[in-house]
Amino acid sequence: AMDTSEFQRLDKIRQLGGSSFVFPSATHTRKEHSVGTAHLALLVVRHLRNAQPELAIDDTDELCVGLAALLHDVGHGPYSHMWEPFVRRCTGDDSYSHEGMGARLVRRICTQIKLQEYIPEASVEFICACIEGLSDDAEWPFSHLSEDKRFLCDIVSNKRSGLDVDKWDYLNRDSVSTLGESSSGGFDVTRLVSAIRVVRGPSRCVGEVAFEEKVALDLNRIFKLRSEMHQMVYQHRVAIVAEAMITDAFLAASESEFRITATSEDGTSREFTLGEAASDCGAFTQLRDGLLETLQTSSASGLERTRQILERLNRREFYQEVGRGAILPTKPLCSECSSETEPRDRFCSQCGASTESRRWDLARRFENNDGRECTVVKPQLLSLSKEDCRRAILDRVEGDSVEEDDVLVGITDIKYGWGYQVPDAHHDRLSWQVRDPLAHVLFFNPKDDVERGYHIPSGKLSQLALPKSTHERVLYCYYRGDPSNTAALRALTEAYERYTKSLPGASAAGRSNPTPSPFARKRRMSGDGPPLPVLDRSGGRTLDMDDCLPPAKRYRDKF
């Protein structure tokens, strides 16, 4: 499977996409991550095979899980996750995903290497299921395989708890590549593998992956690292803008006469637009990160807009940020003072008003064990989309200096853990959708019952290990147009600020970089005359620049 063009192209696709514009060392590829994930998956399968012979894991099971881990990312396009929103906007296909394309490529690879000669043909679909994962309420789709093997689908992509070897590899690999080993806050994978066992849950008849209770804090560290990586790396505002510019360049190229010549799925050689190539397995294998350089040097007509964007990107002239980011509330808001409240609060801690009439949006409805219908809700502003915000900002722009296509809105969405339901303080059939890192993780005690697992309530963990908030959303607005157009920038800034002030519970986000020292703007280069005097605003005394040095250095320089 590794010796195919579908897999080898991953060596030309960076794992972190636009993050390399912020972290120059973030140049590792999807191929490295895929090999690492396959290694970890085989470690887990072999550990379970040796520790629990009763699971009847055979060579075919081990091969399927290993191939699923190795091929789980073959559906990624240029610049990884950025490719999917481009294809959706270009083709209008909102269902397009790298998982769907990956499943098609996996079937193509299995046909090329004649895998059906070694394992049952139905096992190819099992490999795809291991890549996509099975949700807790999904039916078991395979007749050739006992449902007792359902736990195998949790190893590569765990839809129950979110703890899988894919996440273990990319978090450790990405954090070391961007933040460095000393500050990455990594975790010991070998300790986690040795703590795995397949047990039955409290209300299930088939086994699922569980962990020894002693590694609960280690698992919490994984979710903590994930949220930190999203905040500092994956959803860094510069990385988001860089990827937005690349997306705009691809969209402009898709409207030009630029074509990719490739052999299609049916074996014929023809030309494809970028949108067409994204949906054809044959042409898709020709798409790599080098597509940007190809666009810059192509002689196809209609690429002027694409080259203009890429030239700005190369000069790091990113789209202009408008105003300051606005932190959007993620908890229920008090109907009186718009302060955030906890789902179980009966009264607002700020104004003392009752929380009975808090505003919400419907998340889902379901029937509980006694047949009663229950409603799961979420705070109202959690339903706010980027397009909703963009339209609202444009409606508040005064004059005609701002073009509609010049406004770009981004919302960073950082979650700490998996979602679960908390009952409302006033209504017994109403539950709020909140997040808890270990709510869906199954644990066992090797000194007690190794057949039945259990869940650990968040209150049992050390409160030092739990964050004050488990969900953060920040709204940003950018101007795509000419940054020298001060009239448009001023009009857009005023409209954006009016909009953020109208959002209940929203607050200004901090800057990514510290505010520069007032002294830094007045210093001269060394040897460029005497130091400039600086006014001490607190006492009115005129200071020399040497007074800004630490006392130890000031004392040393005198002698």
Please report, for each region that a protein language model flagged, where it lies by residue.
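Generic recognition of long tandem-repeat/solenoid scaffolds
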Residues: 1, 206-211, 334, 439-445
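Cys/His-rich microdomains that often coordinate metals
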Residues: 341-343, 355-357
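Residues immediately within or flanking Cys/His clusters that coordinate Zn2+
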Residues: 331, 345
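A composition/biophysics-driven feature that prefers long, compositionally simple stretches
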Residues: 221, 341, 456-460
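Short cysteine-rich clusters marking metal-coordination/redox-active sites
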Residues: 334-337, 348-351
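Sequence-structural signature of the catalytic-core scaffold of metal-dependent phosphohydrolases
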Residues: 1-67, 75-329, 362-372, 378
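Terminal helices and disordered tails flanking the catalytic cores of nucleotide-processing hydrolases
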Residues: 233, 257-330, 352, 358-559
